[in-house]
C-alpha cells in the first residue's frame, strides 16, 4: 500500500515529525525519521521502516491515527521549524535543535 504525504510538521527539540498522509484513508502519523518526507512524497510502509524512491529507510513510527482537523491545526500552530525569521538569514535560530541535517537547508 502506498502512502502520500499531504503535509509535515517537525519538532526539532525532540526530532519527531508528524505527517498528514493519504493511504486507504487520511491519517496522521507520528514518527522519528531518518529522512524528511516532504508534501507530495510517496512511500510504502514496511516492517523495518519505509520504501521511498526505491530505497529502504528505517523510521520509528510511534502512532498512526485517523486524521483529525483540530489535532492537525494544533500541531501546525505549535510548529517550531522552520522559524519564520530564518527565511531571511538562511540560519537556524533554534538553539536546541537535534536534527543533524536541516530539511529546510538552514545552517
From Swiss-Prot:
The lineage of its organism: Bacteria, Pseudomonadati, Pseudomonadota, Gammaproteobacteria, Enterobacterales. HAMAP family: Anti_adapt_IraM. Belongs to the IraM/RssC family. InterPro entries: Anti-adapter_IraM (IPR014448), PmrD_sf (IPR038679). This is Anti-adapter protein IraM. GO terms for biological process: cellular response to starvation. Signal peptide: none annotated. It is found in: Cytoplasm. It comes from Escherichia coli O17:K52:H18 (strain UMN026 / ExPEC). Inhibits RpoS proteolysis by regulating RssB activity, thereby increasing the stability of the sigma stress factor RpoS during magnesium starvation. It comes from the Bacteria.
